[in-house]
A protein has these predicted regions:
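Non-catalytic beta/alpha edge segments that cap or flank active sites
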Residues: 2-7, 12-208
Length: 208
């Protein structure tokens, strides 16, 4: 039967029954559309700064990330600084990956193209899965701020032993872009339709 014939038959049926189209009231809409708010789940997050020149006192990027995650309700598991040495970076990140009390690691520095920039090379072998969209999204957001210079950012992320590792550039502005534009929401279990928190709880994640 043609679609228009079906439509005509259905219209006639509605006229015969005299049934009015359902119009949700404010109360009905609230009952049907609103889900109970999820309680916030605080994470234990470690922050690593990679720099050959800064000290912790001079580390504005690491301080920004530490302050921001605490302000968001998370716990700063540890904050550290290491030189741009591939093996020192890998050792520090590996320690946190092996610690069941650390849910996520955020690093700053070492993602450029200078000879000593080795963050991606240090952490990529540790990944069980790479979060490819992180670098793509970071560069897309950065383009609005620094134009095509964003091509020189090698921001990377991955999952290892149910721990998320996010590697940001060394500038405080880049850390702000990464936190405000991506990580603040994706490390919040209330973010829909999905976020990273279920993958960090040492259980198989499920959708609700």
């Amino acid at each position: 039967m043609p679609k228009n014939a079906c439509r005509a038959t259905n219209t006639k049926s509605k006229k015969q029954t005299g049934r009015k189209p359902y119009t949700p009231t404010a109360n009905n809409k609230e009952l049907k559309m609103t889900k109970p708010a999820k309680p916030f789940i605080p994470l234990n997050i470690a922050v690593l700064t990679v720099s050959d020149t800064r000290t912790l006192d001079e580390d504005t990027s690491g301080k920004y990330l530490s302050d921001s995650l605490v302000e968001a309700g998370h716990t700063l598991a540890e904050r550290a600084l290491t030189t741009d040495c591939i093996y020192q970076i890998r050792a520090m990140v590996s320690k946190w990956i092996a610690d069941p009390n650390v849910h996520a690691v955020i690093t700053t520095g070492g993602t450029g193209f200078y000879i000593r920039d080795s963050m991606p090379e240090a952490v990529s072998p540790l990944f069980d899965k790479e979060v490819q969209g992180f670098g793509e999204m970071f560069r897309a957001l950065s383009k609005d701020e620094i134009g095509m210079s964003t091509l020189q950012s090698r921001a990377v992320a991955g999952m290892a032993n149910n721990t998320a590792i996010f590697c940001l550039p060394g500038s405080t502005g880049a850390c702000r872009t990464g936190w405000e534009g991506i990580l603040k929401e994706q490390l919040d279990n209330r973010t829909r339709p999905c976020n990273f928190v279920p993958h960090l709880m040492r259980v198989n994640p499920t959708h609700d």
